[in-house]
């Protein structure tokens, strides 16, 4: 096994144990608001601490970028661990059992390892660049024959950037002409993994951060799916605007989405 994958899995499982234990006693959760519709809990921080401790033991010189702490610079800035210790914090806070731990390893700006762990379902999604993607050690393969007609598409709302809401609803309006239905689950990392595992047919979202989607992005691509930004380019980790789907679906999604976007999306 790839040694960095091994450490990422160990870190994700330890963090998942912290989250699962605290999920059973949510009345003890402490939360603070850090922005518009944006919360952090003591469990996010405890999960993050577990992950950092595991990484630091094996790779003390690597740089770690986390949602809650930001960048923890290491001597080796070529290797970056990009972490969301609890993707789906609001679901966790309200008792909706859908959230995950997301860990990606990027070497010289290329994602080499992706791990997303759902501690409630005990589902571990993994990928190594060039070696494919797996769910609990079973190989994942995107169904390339899928089309947008009758599809189930997942999305997330740009709730931290309300000015993007009109574009969000315009895109949904255009897509529902062909798609059958939408899902809005509250975990971008799991949405991407669900594209990789054929549980949904496509996914799109605006305003994400790298820690939301870096691991899931690799998992989709290693399962044979496509990931791009709204210009069909690859700047999504930077722009936060992402589409993931099998090849036929993504082409049709782009054709529907692009006419809905204003000048702020044109690069």
UniProtKB/Swiss-Prot annotation:
Cofactor (UniProt): Mg(2+)
Biological function: Part of the processive rRNA transcription and antitermination complex (rrnTAC). The complex forms an RNA-chaperone ring around the RNA exit tunnel of RNA polymerase (RNAP). It supports rapid transcription and antitermination of rRNA operons, cotranscriptional rRNA folding, and annealing of distal rRNA regions to allow correct ribosome biogenesis. This subunit may play a central role in organizing the structure.
InterPro entries reported for this sequence: IMPase (IPR033942), Inositol_monoP_metal-BS (IPR020583), Inositol_monophosphatase-like (IPR000760), Inositol_monophosphatase_CS (IPR020550), Inositol_monophosphatase_SuhB (IPR022337)
Compartments it resides in: Cytoplasm
GO cellular component entries: cytoplasm
Residues that hold Mg(2+) according to the record: 67, 84, 86
Catalysed reactions, as listed in the record: a myo-inositol phosphate + H2O = myo-inositol + phosphate
GO biological process terms on file: inositol metabolic process; phosphatidylinositol phosphate biosynthetic process; ribosome biogenesis; signal transduction; transcription antitermination
Family designation: Belongs to the inositol monophosphatase superfamily.
Assembly information from the UniProt record: Homodimer. The rRNA transcription and antitermination complex (rrnTAC) consists of RNA polymerase (RNAP), NusA, NusB, NusE (rpsJ), NusG, SubB, ribosomal protein S4, DNA and precursor rRNA; S4 is more flexible than other subunits.
Keyword Flavoprotein: no
Keyword entries, A-Z: Chaperone, Cytoplasm, Hydrolase, Magnesium, Metal-binding, Ribosome biogenesis, RNA-binding, Transcription, Transcription antitermination, Transcription regulation
Organism of derivation: Haemophilus influenzae (strain ATCC 51907 / DSM 11121 / KW20 / Rd)
Ligand binding (substrate): 67, 86-89, 183, 212
Protein name (record): Nus factor SuhB
SUPFAM superfamilies, alphabetized: Carbohydrate phosphatase
Metal-binding among keywords: yes
MF terms in GO: inositol monophosphate 1-phosphatase activity; metal ion binding; RNA binding
Enzyme Commission number(s) from the entry: 3.1.3.25
Main subcellular location: cytoplasm
Pfam families named in the record: Inositol_P
